[in-house]
């Protein structure tokens, strides 16, 4: 045992030394990292917000199986796994997960059914980098960004005419395998990238043993294609799909022989098609004009099962959900250089989420005491927004940033049907209306948000 311990300590010290040596040789200068957190390409130190970047090199060197595991070591970021290896949501600076805006290439992953926040439905093998904005960014990104923003930038070609890579990885936490393959390149103005991956992981290993019902699988594929018509104009498209099968459980219930809890998500799938066109340096003032449009579908099937003792009875709640969200979005952004000291970003955004959700809930308290509730809702939320953000350079290394965003939201619940059948203590239900399904109707509201900040960059390599 002593020899074993000595060997481990020696090996750990050697690995630490090697790691430090490699870090010293491969240090990435922060000033060289380019980000788009401010909706325009900037050096990281020039961004007037608290931004952390997970680079492509860090992603490649990581053993992370999903985006949540890539973000869990960032200060100020907390990853909520909801009892599962494969289901991750992000909280920033203590805010709830639904106050974190999750974007893929600047476009929102919508979650309209729960208040748990959007799950990050993309594989790390498709990602070029991740930009995390810590703190409110409502003028540039809307009110969903009250806690912060996770913007995932996908891979888009390479500098060489052709590159290909593949990987096979094994993870001991769940005895799982992950395989990925990708190829891409640039040739005479044509930029392309293709990738695909598959992961399968068993129940997670913990100090208490293997936790049952925590296995997951996921698969993904994406394709990107763009063409540079000249030095000023580029257009392209991207299509991707991500599908997962996720299970979740709880040690608290597993250790109680009279209770049972599990969540099964046999299907959580995201499909997306996006188009863009961009012009750069169009005249003396207009430095960039970009249009984006996209369609996205988010489909989740879920079963939530809870069994608990209640006196001499056992209460069982078994719920099934089928949620479909279709999202249509478009945006137009113009960047202006107004003299040497003023840079203005203006834009318009449109997003419409269309939700359809079916829920079947069964509650059993005894053989003759059970109820079945069916609910169906259909609705949509339409958001229009205009925004403007100015950066003004002042003397003595000061920069003034100020902006405004005005948002119009139109929410409509067009169908809300709920019926209940069965027996409860002293009551019989026969297609009885369910008063918890909600009421058909619509609501409109609009409001502005503002920002004002003064930044000083007088110290080198700080922001």
Protein language model features and the residues they cover:
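Non-catalytic regulatory/gating segments with a bias toward low-complexity or hydrophobic composition
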Residues: 51, 59, 71, 130-132, ...
């Amino acid at each position: 045992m002593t020899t074993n311990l000595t060997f481990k300590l020696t090996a750990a010290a050697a690995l630490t030394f090697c790691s430090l040596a490699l870090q010293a040789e491969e240090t990435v200068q922060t000033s060289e990292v380019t980000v788009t957190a401010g909706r325009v390409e900037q050096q990281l130190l020039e961004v007037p917000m608290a931004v952390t970047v997970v680079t492509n090199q860090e992603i490649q060197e990581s053993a992370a199986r999903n985006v949540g595991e890539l973000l869990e070591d960032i200060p100020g970021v907390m990853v909520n796994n909801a009892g599962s290896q494969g289901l991750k949501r992000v909280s920033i600076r203590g805010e709830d997960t639904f106050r974190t805006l999750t974007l893929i290439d600047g476009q929102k992953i919508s979650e309209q059914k729960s208040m748990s926040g959007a799950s990050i439905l993309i594989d790390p093998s498709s990602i070029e980098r991740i930009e995390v904005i810590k703190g409110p960014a409502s003028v540039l990104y809307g009110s969903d960004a009250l806690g912060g923003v996770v913007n995932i930038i996908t891979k888009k070609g390479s500098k060489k005419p052709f590159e290909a890579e593949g990987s096979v990885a094994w993870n001991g936490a769940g005895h799982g395998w992950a395989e990925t393959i990708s190829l891409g390149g640039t040739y005479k103005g044509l930029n392309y990238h293709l990738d695909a991956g598959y992961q399968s992981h068993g129940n997670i290993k913990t100090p208490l043993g293997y936790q049952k019902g925590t296995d997951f699988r996921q698969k993904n594929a994406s394709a990107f294609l763009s063409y540079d018509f000249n030095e000023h104009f580029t257009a392209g498209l991207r299509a991707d799909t991500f599908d997962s099968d996720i299970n979740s459980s709880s040690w608290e219930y597993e250790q109680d022989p009279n209770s049972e809890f599990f969540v099964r998500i046999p299907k959580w799938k995201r499909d997306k098609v996006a188009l863009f066109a961009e012009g750069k340096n169009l005249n003396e003032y207009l430095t960039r004009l970009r249009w984006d449009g996209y369609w996205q579908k988010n489909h989740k099937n879920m079963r939530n099962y809870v069994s608990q003792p209640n006196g001499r009875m056992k209460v069982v709640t078994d719920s099934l959900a089928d949620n479909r969200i279709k999202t249509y979005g478009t945006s137009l952004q113009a960047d202006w250089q107004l003299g040497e000291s003023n840079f203005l970003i203006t834009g318009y955004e449109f997003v419409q989420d269309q939700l359809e959700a079916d829920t079947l809930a069964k509650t059993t308290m005894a053989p003759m005491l059970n109820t079945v509730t069916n609910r169906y809702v259909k609705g949509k939320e339409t958001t229009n927004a205009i925004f403007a953000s100015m950066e003004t350079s002042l003397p003595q290394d000061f920069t003034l940033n100020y902006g405004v965003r005005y948002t119009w939201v139109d929410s409509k619940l067009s169908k809300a049907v709920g019926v209940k059948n069965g027996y409860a203590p002293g009551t019989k239900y026969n297609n009885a209306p369910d008063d918890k399904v909600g009421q058909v109707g619509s609501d409109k509201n609009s409001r502005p948000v503002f920002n004002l900040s003064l930044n000083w960059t007088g110290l080198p390599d700080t922001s």
